[in-house]
Structure formats: C-alpha cells, structure tokens
C-alpha cells in the first residue's frame, strides 16, 4: 500500500529547513521583493554611461550586490516552493521572483 505524504507541519522540526537566516518571514521576503524594482532601475541607469573606470567599477559593484539580493530572494522562494509544490503562496512567490529575474536580465542587456 502506498504511503500518504505527511504535511510539512507534521514532520519533526529537525527535518525542516530553517530559512530565517535568509528572511525572517514571508513578509520580509515580500518587502525585499518590492524594493527590487527601484534597485533594478538604478542599475539600468548605467546604460550608455560605461565610459570610464570609475563608472564601470560602480556599475560592477551595483550589479554584484543586486545579483546577491536576487539570488537570496530566489533561493528562499525556491525552497519555500520545494517544501510543498501544492501551496499557492509558494507557487506565487516562485513565479514572481522568476519574473523579477527576467526584468533584471532584460534591464542589464545593454
């Protein structure tokens, strides 16, 4: 007979991810996601202005920091999604960070 999968809440905590080092809560993740648009726009503003070493250095620093933030947002959403792929909230988080990533790479394709 097939075993029925347990709900995440039924699992021993030692077998559950602690994602709080990345984001304290889903609400904290949402706030970081909302702030991402302004950061993408600020990095996209470098388009056509990479003509000297100082500006290029600033651009590289800004894109490196932005990529770190996107990676953290993505990892959190992906792991929340992987906890239970049936959950609509996690599916939404995963879809939205993927959409933001597309926005980022589009903005940086100059």
Kindly give the residue locations of the regions a language model identified.
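N-terminal helix-rich structural modules
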Residues: 1-110
């Amino acid at each position: 007979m097939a075993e029925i999968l347990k709900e995440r809440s039924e699992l021993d905590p030692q077998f559950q991810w602690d994602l709080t080092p990345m984001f304290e809560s889903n609400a904290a993740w949402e706030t970081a996601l909302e702030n991402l648009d302004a950061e993408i726009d600020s990095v996209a503003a470098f388009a056509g202005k990479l003509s000297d070493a100082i500006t290029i250095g600033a651009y590289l620093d800004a894109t490196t920091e932005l990529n770190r933030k996107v990676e953290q947002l993505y990892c959190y959403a992906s792991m929340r999604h992987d906890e239970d792929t049936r959950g609509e909230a996690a599916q939404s988080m995963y879809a939205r960070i993927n959409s933001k990533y597309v926005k980022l790479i589009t903005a940086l394709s100059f």
